[in-house]
């Protein structure tokens, strides 16, 4: 970020900002929905408090609460889905049809954030085709202009894939080819358990109840929400029949689900939010102070986030200065590159051939770090091991998150090529 540089604070600054703006958009969307429907007259009489429900519920989910702090692709994705819902609600409230351009912008930038944005956008397309109100819109140029805006926003991602063998589309789309029906109950259980955890248990129940109430409504916006929710749910369930659905994939639905809570009359939504906030506090407290000593297997905050600055400091002390640090796993390479001072980091993996970073020549020497959790040795076709050194541990408050083997290695040549295209010299973090 412009004011904090490449620091943890700078990288995470836009998380809370986007969550705050997205919350305002969601509350305004709820207000417009309430004001446009006589069916909600009783609820609307409670005014602004009722419209606040979606914003409070969304921010009480563990996924969104933590997402504002740790910054994942889901953070901008949730914001753009909130912007999309706000834009559509303005259209259905009789505002200028130029809001379709903002719908297209939201859809395109949401896709750039994470490809799962296509699912609720496909739900919007289904609503346009399946309902009379939607087909009336299709007779005007505005939805088509919005689609053009979306395509323009998506164009850089598509162009990059077109010039790089469609690699990211094949990787993400290739998941649909996974098929292990014998593990269906395991995958379904993981999908259900993941949502109960990321939404928080009572908010998950609240989402289910909200969809039940949506099914009873006949107004345009309720039908639109149903399309944007049920179509992606059907895709996730179908995928879970034969393959794993990552717990964070359905987070794309959380803005629409939170908005649906407006039509739930029960007061226990406050208790649901309180439980979600309590879970958030517990997770953040564990990440910061680790009051409960858990193994990395059970403590995700320790396993993924614990002790990185101290670990890299230990690496720099124990490995000779002015030598190359090497990682053959992209997560470790990224952490080393972010925290290391005045030292080059070389990443080695097939994915790096698709990036515009400088490559290394074969024969280069350096120190390879590998997690002991991988339970294997460095690939002998890629590296010549010259020596092995004592492991270096990454820990937080004396709890060991992981241990890393340290090898002095030389990059092997692949065929007759002098340059190793599967390597990348990562840019130094200038803080």
For each feature predicted by the language model, list its residue ranges.
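Transmembrane-helix motifs of polytopic, lipid-linked glycan transferases
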Residues: 13-40, 83
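Specific aromatic-rich, kink-prone transmembrane helix
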Residues: 25, 76-93, 99-107, 257-260
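Membrane-interface transmembrane helices that cradle and orient dolichyl/undecaprenyl
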Residues: 31-34, 44-45, 84-100, 209, ...
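Short helix- or helix-capping micro-motifs
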Residues: 51-62, 107, 111, 125
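Short acidic/glycine- and proline-prone juxtamembrane loop motifs at membrane-interface regions
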Residues: 63-77
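Transmembrane-lumen/periplasm boundary regions of multi-pass, lipid-linked membrane glycan transferases
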Residues: 121-219, 237
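Hydrophobic/aromatic-rich transmembrane helices and adjacent perimembrane loops
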Residues: 230-233, 242-270
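Membrane-proximal, lumen/periplasm-facing interface regions of secretory-pathway glyco-
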Residues: 247, 269-321, 330-353, 369-408, ...
């Amino acid at each position: 970020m412009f004011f904090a540089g490449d620091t943890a604070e700078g990288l995470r600054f836009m998380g809370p900002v986007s969550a705050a703006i997205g919350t305002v958009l969601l509350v305004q969307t709820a207000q417009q929905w309430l004001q446009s429907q006589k069916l909600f007259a009783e609820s609307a009489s409670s005014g602004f408090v009722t419209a606040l429900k979606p914003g409070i519920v969304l921010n009480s989910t563990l996924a969104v609460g933590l997402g504002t702090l740790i910054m994942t692709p889901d953070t901008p994705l949730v914001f753009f889905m909130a912007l999309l819902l706000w834009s559509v609600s303005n259209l259905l409230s009789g505002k200028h049809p130029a809001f379709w351009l903002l719908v297209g912008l939201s859809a395109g930038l949401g896709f750039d954030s994470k490809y799962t944005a296509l699912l609720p956008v496909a739900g919007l397309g289904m609503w346009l085709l399946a309902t009379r109100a939607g087909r009336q819109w299709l007779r005007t140029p505005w939805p088509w202009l919005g689609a053009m805006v979306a395509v323009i926003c998506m164009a850089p991602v598509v162009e990059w894939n077109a010039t790089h063998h469609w690699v990211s589309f094949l990787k993400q789309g290739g998941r649909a080819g996974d098929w292990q029906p014998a593990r269906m109950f395991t995958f379904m259980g993981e999908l259900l358990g993941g949502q109960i955890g990321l939404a928080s248990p009572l908010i998950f129940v609240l989402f289910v109840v909200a969809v039940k109430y949506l099914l009873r409504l006949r107004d345009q916006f309720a039908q639109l929400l149903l399309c944007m929710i049920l179509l992606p749910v059907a895709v996730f369930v179908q995928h879970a029949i034969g393959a794993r659905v990552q717990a964070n994939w359905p987070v794309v639905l959380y803005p629409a689900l939170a908005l649906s809570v407006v039509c739930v009359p029960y007061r226990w939504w406050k208790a649901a939010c309180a439980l979600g906030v309590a879970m958030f506090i517990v997770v953040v407290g564990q990440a910061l102070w680790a009051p409960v000593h858990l193994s990395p297997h059970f403590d995700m905050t320790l396993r993924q986030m614990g002790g990185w600055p101290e670990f890299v400091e230990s690496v720099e002390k124990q490995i000779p200065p002015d030598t190359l640090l090497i990682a053959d796993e992209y997560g470790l390479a990224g952490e080393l590159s972010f925290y290391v001072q005045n030292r080059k980091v070389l990443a080695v993996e097939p994915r790096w051939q698709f990036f515009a970073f400088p490559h290394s020549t074969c024969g280069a020497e350096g120190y390879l770090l590998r997690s002991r959790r991988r339970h294997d040795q460095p690939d002998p076709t890629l590296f010549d091991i010259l020596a092995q050194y004592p492991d270096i541990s990454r820990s937080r408050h004396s709890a060991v998150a992981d241990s890393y083997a340290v090898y002095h290695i030389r990059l092997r040549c692949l065929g007759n090529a002098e340059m190793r295209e599967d390597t990348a010299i990562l840019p130094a973090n200038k803080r």
